[in-house]
């Protein structure tokens, strides 16, 4: 997909960087899980809002992408998903309903027939409504898109960092199996390159 009005980095949401069967989604209350929650919070609060306009598809059509659609598209490139089934359901439904007249993700999920979904949505939305309307911060132009892009990159970076640690641990136990060691070293090098590319997009300096 291509957008004539955005930079090259934004024209191409994250490409196929992460091997499908290689990385694992966090299963506990870790920094990775917290980033997942922030992503789902963005979907619940702003899932219906358009952050990309005039995206050109392969067949020459143009479409707009909402927050939910962008996240679903980006994670779908590498078959990534959240560790919590509720999160995946929220993303799937928000992406499916985006573009429908009158759809508001927050109200939709707070009224969801599944109590597990509606309770989670209410929890994710609650701190927004603790502020009176006059004191609620306004999203600067382009701010929502940049926040969502950064969260998606953080999500991918955490997966990559975890995999690097896993490879390092495996290298310590590989013993005299030189073929396996070679495979692990090659994967470590490739994964480092992915990490460095993500770090550049995030504006981070990676210390080797």
Which ranges hold each PLM region?
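Bacterial replisome coupling helices
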Residues: 14, 76, 85, 89-208
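Non-catalytic protein-protein interaction segments used by genome-maintenance enzymes to assemble
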Residues: 3-102, 106, 121-134, 164
